[in-house]
Amino acid sequence: MMNPLIIKLGGVLLDSEEALERLFTALVNYREAHQRPLIIVHGGGCVVDELMKQLNLPVQKKNGLRVTPAEQIDIITGALAGTANKTLLAWAKKHGISSVGLFLGDGDSVKVTQLDAELGHVGLAQPGSPTLINTLLAGGYLPVVSSIGVTDEGQLMNVNADQAATALAATLGADLILLSDVSGILDGKGQRIAEMTAEKAEQLIEQGIITDGMIVKVNAALDAARALGRPVDIASWRHAEQLPALFNGTPIGTRILA
């Protein structure tokens, strides 16, 4: 079996029917032409934010990571492992793709511990067991994995989806693409940067060009590239016609080098 490809979906994508239609059409086209097994890992920040708003609950962030108090973890689990995950499974079904919905704890695929008591139920993801997902891939299924995990003590944890995807890629020896709303990392003039090293990233963070959530994304991609010993791509789902080429290894966004 070729080494798998993990496609990590950014939260806003789940809010856009047009984006989902483009993505799943690209997935169908790619699967018809290539044997490479695919896995989707998703967060769903926008789904969670919308639910929090409806329930009048505060959304707090610390260094770009969502603070998850004990009284909110059930709600966030429902939004990510429930609504967001099943929405993606429904789109897969609509496009004739046999898919299976999972969370990080299924088959111990990704091990999770608490990251920081101040963040509450926020987990640190580490590689786990490849057995379950490899079994599903061998059966021709598309695993769709939410970024909810569970500790050995049975505590549910909200995990940053970029970091969850990195840990799963390390588990499976997979390549990783981080799909988001931006066409890659942009320089001070709004131009796409084709390749990025750790040194270049540090400079741009110091200069205030890479900020907030993008710092988390770049650091996750750098961590992933280091952990996996191979480049990681950050790209946009907006260029659907380019996605099959991206899935096949052609960079269309920013390639993060280890």
From Swiss-Prot:
Keyword terms, alphabetized: Amino-acid biosynthesis, Arginine biosynthesis, ATP-binding, Cytoplasm, Kinase, Nucleotide-binding, Transferase
Protein species of origin: Klebsiella pneumoniae subsp. pneumoniae (strain ATCC 700721 / MGH 78578)
Protein residues bound to substrate: G44, G45, R66, N158
Membership in a protein family: Belongs to the acetylglutamate kinase family. ArgB subfamily.
MF term (GO), any: ATP binding
Lineage top rank: taxon: Bacteria
Residues carrying the site annotation Transition state stabilizer: K8, K217
GO terms for biological process, alphabetical: arginine biosynthetic process via ornithine; L-arginine biosynthetic process
Protein name per the record: Acetylglutamate kinase
